[in-house]
Amino acid sequence: MKRIVILISGRGSNMQAMLKVAAAERWPAQIAAVISNQPNAAGLDVARAAGIATSAINHRDYPDRELFDAALAELVDQHSPDLIVLAGFMRILTPGFVNKYFGRLINIHPSLLPSFPGLHTHQQAIDAGVKVHGATVHFVTAELDHGPIIAQAIVPVLEDDTEDLSLIHISEPTRPY
């Protein structure tokens, strides 16, 4: 059975959806651990309640990205993952970290890449006047939000959408995993 480590920074809504899918009999993987760069991330409580190993490693405790990523890699490696999923992990990873896990590191991004990389994707979609928005699962490369696409899911952008409403449309029924 494949082992997955999930990295989060907040409430873990994508992680929660993965936990639900992982509970299905036919899912060929085990979520081995959830790790957050925010010690008070609400998603850690959700993972603990589901019986999943959790850890927090505060990026503010490290003077630079390289040292943080090295410590994060040590923590990840303790769980011997086959796959590392960035599910709302709000840190840009160093090329060293990305290269270490190349081909095993995927991201869940809240837009239809290559459109709207980076932050505030829902507002970007509304401002651009697009009629559809969505989410992308892609392999992580050193270039932000540019790795090969694995899957995408589409939702309509409604005329009265705000950034918060767009978040709701994209959240549950259209997750691309």
Which functions belong to the PLM regions below?
Residues 54-55, 83, 105, 132:
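Hydrophobic beta-strand scaffold residues
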